[in-house]
């Protein structure tokens, strides 16, 4: 015998109201922080590095994420944080744990709303076509020389996270660089 559970209208309404509440909280946090971050970037304030971490922490709280960290994130500046990319939630979760900007495909810069958020996090956008790889690698190196931590998903795409895909060597080669007179710190 098969059992089928019918979701009542009240349960659906409760779920919809909870989702609406989360969206309202998200917008209530995001909209006021946008101009603040814009000003911090314009003033070259060190807080322009810190505010995104506060923002991601608030987003994790709004979404109900309980983030557990195993190990200790590097505190050496600069650090290249390297990770598999499972979903866009990775940005929020990693952004809560580490004070970093990310390296992302150039198309994201043109996305409505989220492209703007990525720009305000000081994301380094890269064109995946090979002829621009050297220029992007140099831009990443300059950011590291300036002391910026960067997050890189070297597979260049998201996956289920169960296996490591082919690495996009042109950008990942920055890991071989000497930055500020020493080997670059890399943390998976």
Question: What function would you assign to each model-found segment?
Answer:
Residues 61-188:
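Soluble catalytic domains of membrane acyltransferases
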């Amino acid at each position: 015998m098969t059992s089928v559970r019918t979701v009542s209208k009240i349960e659906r309404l409760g779920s919809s109201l909870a989702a609406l509440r989360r969206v309202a909280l998200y917008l209530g946090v995001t909209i006021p922080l946008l101009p603040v971050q814009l000003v911090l970037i314009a003033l070259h304030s060190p807080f322009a590095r810190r505010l995104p971490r506060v923002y991601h922490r608030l987003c994790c709280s709004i979404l109900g994420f309980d983030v557990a960290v195993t190990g200790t994130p590097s505190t050496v500046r600069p650090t290249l944080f390297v990770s598999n990319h499972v979903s866009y939630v990775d940005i929020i979760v990693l952004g809560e744990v580490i004070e970093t900007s990310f390296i992302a495909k150039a198309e994201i810069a043109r996305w409505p709303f989220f492209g703007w958020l990525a720009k305000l996090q000081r994301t380094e956008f890269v064109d995946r076509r090979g002829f621009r790889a050297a220029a992007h690698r140099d831009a990443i190196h300059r950011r590291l020389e300036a002391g910026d931590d960067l997050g890189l998903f070297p597979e260049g795409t998201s996956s289920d996270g169960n296996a490591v895909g082919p690495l996009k060597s042109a950008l990942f080669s920055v890991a071989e660089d000497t930055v500020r007179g020493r080997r670059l710190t890399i943390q998976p």
